[in-house]
Amino acid sequence: IGGLAKGHMVREIDALGGVMALNTDATGIQFRMLNAGKGPSVRAPRAQCDKKAYQFRIKHTLESEPLIDIHQANVAELIVKDDTITGVTTSLQMQINSRSVVLSAGTFMRGLMHVGLKNESGGRMGDATSTVSDSLHALGFHVERFKTGTPCRINGKSIDFSKTEVQ
């Protein structure tokens, strides 16, 4: 959580009353100041959190909020009436109407996975790719794909920890 690229966003969410920073404080297992030896304009706090504890605390916070209804689904289409988004239709044909919609697309819009020389449509760990990009395109939005990469994982048993230093 935080870092050079996203630390300002965490601070903005905190300033607006969000719980991201509070949850990070409660579930953090390592806190560092990046670029501590450089000038103040390039310093940035970063925290590593216990992933499961962070998820459970955020889930509890959201589920405890009386004015929030939580639906987990793959949004297939945006419902538009008179140039206003009034809801969404899910891939299971469930219609959810709302006065406002926050679209958090993540990385699954037209998701394409590359494994070696093979390419296939999809998201992480077998999840389906999102089709909401087709709905956005039909509404006149320019939708692009951005390539992200996940490096190979290292087997912890192959590391000689005697040659590392504690941070």
Name these PLM-found stretches.
Residues 89-100:
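Core beta-strand elements of the Rossmann-like FAD/NAD(P) dinucleotide-binding domain
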Residues 1-77, 92, 104-122, 127-133, ...:
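Conserved N-terminal/central alpha/beta ligand/cofactor-binding core
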Residues 68, 85, 98-99:
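Local beta-strand N-terminus motif with an aromatic residue
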Residues 80-83:
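Catalytic cores of nucleotide-enabled group-transfer and carboxylate-activating enzymes in metabolic
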